[in-house]
Amino acid sequence: MLKDRENILSALREKPAKTYQLMRRANLPNEEACQSLLLKMRDEGLVKFDIHKGLWEIG
């Protein structure tokens, strides 16, 4: 799980992305697990979600 977090953060350093794009860049096979991890990271303040654009970005 720690490796998945690192993969997500490195993917977001390139540019903000939608969930499916993040899954491809971070090499995560399960969309549900990816969304769950993103929500946990959002609660911790590591990432933000722009509701108007539908993009995840580094917090």
Locations of regions flagged by a protein language model:
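Glycine-centered, phosphate/nucleic-acid-interacting loop/turn motifs that mediate DNA/RNA or nucleotide
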Residues: 45
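Short acidic, hydrophobic short linear motifs in intrinsically disordered regions
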Residues: 16-26
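Short, leucine-enriched amphipathic alpha-helices that occur as contiguous helical runs
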Residues: 1-9, 31
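Short amphipathic alpha-helical interaction segments
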Residues: 29-40
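Short helix-to-turn junction characteristic of helix-turn-helix DNA-binding domains
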Residues: 11-15
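Residue-level "edge-of-site" marker
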Residues: 25, 36, 54-55
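Short, cationic-aromatic polyanion-contact patches
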Residues: 1-2, 49-59
